[in-house]
Amino acid sequence: MLLIAGLGNPGPQYAHNRHNIGFMAADEIFRRHRFSNWQKKFQAEIADGVIDGEKVLLVKPQTFMNLSGQSIGEAMRFYKMTPADLVVIYDELDLVPGKLRIKTGGGSGGHNGIKSIDAHMQSFPGGQNYRRMRLGIGHPGAKELVHNYVLGDFAKADNEWLDTLMGAVADNVAMLARREDNSFMNRIALAMGDGNQRPGGVKTDPAQLEKAPPKAQSHIRQARQNQKKPNIPESGPMAEMLKKLLGKKD
């Protein structure tokens, strides 16, 4: 059995926040696969289904982000699961929008939801060795801007890459059930344009950058560059006259 937990804050006022991208991913998985209706249990909204022959429990903790571990730990104890059975989906400031990374174990990176889960996983065999799916939301640039940034809504310009990312995660979730994490990341990168994507859906190909045309020049400079050098005679009457005219010495 696999438990997929999407992190976020409950309530309509948070629904479109960057911090709620984990909830968004869980909702898209729910929509694209056969799951039971959402029900309230373990201080969460949960739904169960089967993906590629693997029983999957979707969990959206309703405890608010900072207490996510309470809900997830309760569900895992009920189903007698270990951290190896857990995948947590959450927002990552240190990845550009549209990037995705999966890693087993590691630190919290300052994410309060992950801090809470790490604390509750200490009572399980395997501790913090659960899979973490980080979805890039970008960084506002200064530490003091982070709070309002993560609790702010995605801009309309983000919808293109956000919809593509959510769809790719949901469509390829069977790879997570099979523990094919590298193949999953490769598939997402392809869906997002080989991973070379800037915020706002603008794709950048390194090969194209290397072959970029020179900067535009003014028509005067172009004319000067294309102008042929005059053919000045070096000897004869004309050469002598030019020397006198220009004051050129031998």
Swiss-Prot record:
Active site: 19 (proton acceptor)
Keywords noted in UniProt: Cytoplasm, Hydrolase, RNA-binding, tRNA-binding
Key word Ion transport present: no
Biased composition regions of type Basic and acidic residues, renumbered to the chain: 241-250
Cellular component aspect of the GO annotation: cytoplasm
Pfam families in alphabetical order: Pept_tRNA_hydro
Catalytic activity: an N-acyl-L-alpha-aminoacyl-tRNA + H2O = an N-acyl-L-amino acid + a tRNA + H(+)
Alphabetized PROSITE patterns for the sequence: PEPT_TRNA_HYDROL_1 (PS01195), PEPT_TRNA_HYDROL_2 (PS01196)
Binding sites annotated in the UniProt record for tRNA: 14, 64, 66, 112
GO terms (BP aspect): protein quality control for misfolded or incompletely synthesized proteins; rescue of stalled ribosome
Compartments, record wording: Cytoplasm
Documented EC number(s): 3.1.1.29
Site (Discriminates between blocked and unblocked aminoacyl-tRNA) residue list: 9
SUPFAM superfamilies associated with the record: Peptidyl-tRNA hydrolase-like (SSF53178)
Known partners and oligomeric status: Monomer.
Task performed by this protein: Hydrolyzes ribosome-free peptidyl-tRNAs (with 1 or more amino acids incorporated), which drop off the ribosome during protein synthesis, or as a result of ribosome stalling.
Family membership: Belongs to the PTH family.
Protein name as it appears in the record: Peptidyl-tRNA hydrolase
Species of origin: Brucella abortus (strain 2308)
